Amino acid sequence: MAKGLSLFERRRQRVRTTLRAKGNHRPRLSVHRSGQHIYAQVIDDDQRRTVVAASTLEKAVRDKSGATVAAAAETGKRLAERASAAGITKVVFDRGGFLFHGRVKALADAAREGGLEF
């Protein structure tokens, strides 16, 4: 890279550094957003494995709506249900380099309403 990191990559590094400092060995709720879909997963970094995951690619969500805020909220709700079934209540929210706005915020709010604490 001739010029260094892009703004997105610098923001992602800054968020991850903060998570490592404040994480206290909690599982990490990682969010990835594309133009068509949103993906979320709860990752246990100590064991290096994904505990639960949800996305708008799932048939039940995909049939209802596409890349909308409502679809992101439904994904957050499903993720919270699966996490509570796996015994996870407290997580650290990893938004990656994405701004906390729109679909990312809708997913986070729905996950909080579903019982996840962050």
From Swiss-Prot:
Gene Ontology CC entries for this record: cytoplasm; ribonucleoprotein complex; ribosome
Keyword entries, A-Z: Ribonucleoprotein, Ribosomal protein, RNA-binding, rRNA-binding
GO BP terms, alphabetized: translation
A molecular function GO annotation: structural constituent of ribosome
Origin superkingdom: Bacteria
Residues making up the signal peptide according to the UniProt record: none
SUPFAM superfamilies in the record: Translational machinery components
Pfam families linked to this entry: Ribosomal_L18p (PF00861)
Family, as annotated: Belongs to the universal ribosomal protein uL18 family.
HAMAP family recorded: Ribosomal_uL18_B
UniProt-recorded name of the protein: Large ribosomal subunit protein uL18
Gene: rplR
